[in-house]
Regions:
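C-terminal accessory module of base-excision DNA glycosylases/AP lyases that mediates lesion recognition
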Residues: 1-15, 19, 112-121, 127-185
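Alpha-helical ds-nucleic-acid-binding substructure associated with the helix-hairpin-helix region
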Residues: 46-121
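Short Gly/aromatic-enriched secondary-structure transition segments
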Residues: 40-46
Length: 185
C-alpha cells in the first residue's frame, strides 16, 4: 500500500485515498464532471462532515443528512444530491456484497475478468472508471488481477507526483478531443 497517491493538492487527502480503501472507491465514484482534485478530496470532506468513512454507517445514514454533507459549501460535488445517492448506494453494495470491506472487491477477485465484473457492478463505474480504477490498483497497490485493466492511454494509475497529475490532465484533454474528432469525422 502506498503512503500517498498524488491526485490532489491536499497531503491529507492524498494519504487518505491511499490508506483507506473506501475513500479511494468513493473518489472514483464521484470522479465525473468535476476536477480530479475535487473528486479525490471528496472523501476527506465527507469524513470531516459526517464523522466517518465506514461503509455500513454511510449506507444506513439518513439520505438528507448525507446530501447536506455533499451540498454544504464548499460542495463536495457540483451535483450533491446525485453523488450523495451514488455514494450511499455504493456503500450499500460494499456492505451487502463485501461485508462492509471495500478492499474485498479486489483482494478476493480471482482474475481480471472477475475484477472487471466486480468493479463494473458498482454504482457509477463504467468502462473508463473500470480501467482507471484498475490501473491504480495494479500500479500503486500491486493487485495482480488488475494488471490487464491498465490502459495504454494516460490514466490515474500512472501518476506518481503533482507534475504527473498536471501532465495527465493535459493528456486527458487531448485524448478526449481526439475521440470527439474521430466521432465527428
Amino acid at each position: 500500500m502506498p503512503e500517498a497517491l498524488y491526485f490532489t493538492d491536499s497531503d491529507e487527502a492524498n494519504r487518505l485515498i491511499a490508506q483507506e480503501p473506501l475513500a479511494l472507491l468513493i473518489s472514483f465514484a464521484i470522479d465525473q464532471q468535476v476536477t480530479v482534485q475535487q473528486a479525490f478530496t471528496g472523501p476527506l470532506k465527507l469524513r470531516e462532515r459526517v464523522g466517518t468513512l465506514d461503509a455500513p454507517a454511510i449506507a444506513e445514514m439518513d439520505p438528507a443528512t448525507l446530501e447536506t454533507a455533499f451540498r454544504t459549501p464548499p460542495a463536495i460535488h457540483r451535483f450533491p444530491r446525485a453523488m450523495a445517492q451514488r455514494v450511499q448506494a455504493l456503500c450499500q453494495v460494499v456492505v451487502d456484497e463485501y461485508g462492509g470491506k471495500a478492499e474485498r472487491i479486489w483482494t478476493e477477485a480471482t482474475d481480471a475478468a472477475d475484477l472487471r465484473k466486480r468493479i463494473g457492478a458498482l454504482p457509477g463505474f463504467g468502462k473508463m472508471k473500470i480501467t482507471g480504477f484498475g490501473s491504480v490498483l495494479a500500479l500503486h497497490f500491486g493487485v495482480e488481477a488488475a494488471q490487464e485493466l491498465v490502459p495504454e492511454y494516460p490514466c490515474l494509475g500512472k501518476i506518481n507526483s503533482a507534475e504527473d497529475l498536471a501532465e495527465y490532465q493535459a493528456a486527458k484533454r487531448a485524448h478526449k478531443a481526439s475521440l470527439r474528432a474521430q466521432a465527428s469525422a
